[in-house]
C-alpha cells in the first residue's frame, strides 16, 4: 500500500522511479486498521503524517516519510529517503505500528533555520524478532541541522521467541527522551540488541536535560544503549551525565564527538 500527497512526474512513473516531490500542504491521517500481507509494505509520504490507528506489515515494512521530496526504493538497502525538507514537516505516531521480522522506518525533515519538532512518538512501535530468526529494525530520523524528535511510548525490537534482539535508532539534531519511554531489544535466548541515540549534543539530567538517569536505567534493563553525538554546526558533540545511572546487565556506551 502506497499513499502520497506529493506529485510524481510522468517520466518517473513510466520509468518506475518512485520520486515524489511538491509543496502540497495535504496530510495523511490514519485512524483505522491497515494490515499488509506477509512481506508487504505500507508507505505514507506527505508533508505531515498522523497515525492514531493500527498498521501491521510483518516480514515487510512500514515506511513514513515527511518532506517535500521523498525517494522510495523498496529493492535497495535504503528503502525511503527524505531528500528535501518541507515547511512544518511532522510525523505524529500515537497509534500502533507492527512489523515483526521487518522494518519500521520513520523519517522527516523540516524547512527553515529554526529548530522544529519533526517526529513526535507517543504510541507503540514493534519490530520484534520472529521465531524463524528474522529480526526487526526501528528508525526515527530527523535532520542533523535543526530538527528535533520527541521519543516516548514504546519501541520494541525484542526477541521473545528465540533469536537475537533487533536494532533501534533515534537520530536528529536534538533527541528528547520522555520519562514514560519503554524501549526493549531484549533476547530471551540469543544476543540482546541495541538502541542507538544519535544527536548533536546530549544531556542526562534529573530535570532540564534530554533524558533522565532513571530513564537510562530503565532502558538498560531492556537492552544495550549507545549514545553517539555528532557535533554538527554550532553544537559541540558533548555528552553530559548529570544524574545517577545504575544497571547490572547489558552495556552502556557513550561516544562523544569531542
Give, region by region, the residue ranges found by the protein language model.
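Extracellular and secretory-pathway beta-repeat/beta-biased strand scaffolds
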Residues: 1-258
Amino acid at each position: 500500500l502506497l499513499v502520497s500527497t506529493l506529485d510524481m512526474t510522468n517520466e518517473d512513473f513510466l520509468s518506475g522511479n518512485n520520486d515524489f516531490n511538491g509543496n502540497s500542504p495535504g496530510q495523511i491521517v490514519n485512524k483505522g486498521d491497515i494490515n499488509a500481507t506477509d512481506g508487504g509494505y505500507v508507505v505514507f509520504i506527505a508533508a505531515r503524517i498522523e497515525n492514531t490507528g493500527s498498521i501491521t506489515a510483518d516480514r515487510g515494512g512500514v515506511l513514513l516519510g515527511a518532506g517535500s521530496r521523498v525517494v522510495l526504493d523498496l529493492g535497495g538497502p535504503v528503502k525511503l529517503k527524505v531528500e528535501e525538507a518541507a515547511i512544518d514537516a511532522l510525523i505524529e505516531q500515537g497509534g500502533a505500528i507492527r512489523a515483526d521480522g521487518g522494518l519500521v522506518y520513520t523519517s522527516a525533515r523540516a524547512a527553515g533555520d529554526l529548530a522544529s519538532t519533526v517526529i513526535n512518538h507517543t504510541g507503540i512501535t514493534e519490530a520484534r524478532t520472529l521465531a524463524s530468526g528474522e529480526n526487526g529494525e526501528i528508525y526515527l530520523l530527523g535532520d542533523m541541522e535543526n530538527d528535533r524528535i520527541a521519543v516516548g511510548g514504546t519501541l520494541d525490537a525484542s526477541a521473545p521467541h528465540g533469536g537475537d534482539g533487533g536494532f533501534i535508532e533515534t537520530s536528529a539534531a536534538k533527541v528528547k527522551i520522555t520519562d514514560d519511554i519503554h524501549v526493549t531489544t531484549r533476547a530471551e535466548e540469543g544476543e540482546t540488541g541495541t538502541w542507538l541515540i544519535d544527536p548533536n549534543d546530549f544531556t542526562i539530567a534529573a530535570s532540564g536535560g534530554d533524558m533522565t538517569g532513571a530513564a537510562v536505567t530503565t532502558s538498560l534493563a531492556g537492552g544495550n544503549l549507545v549514545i553517539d553525538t555528532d557535533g554538527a554546526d554550532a553544537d559541540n558533540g558533548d555528552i553530559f551525565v548529570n544524574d545517577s545511572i545504575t544497571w547490572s546487565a547489558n552495556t552502556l556506551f557513550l561516544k562523544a564527538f569531542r
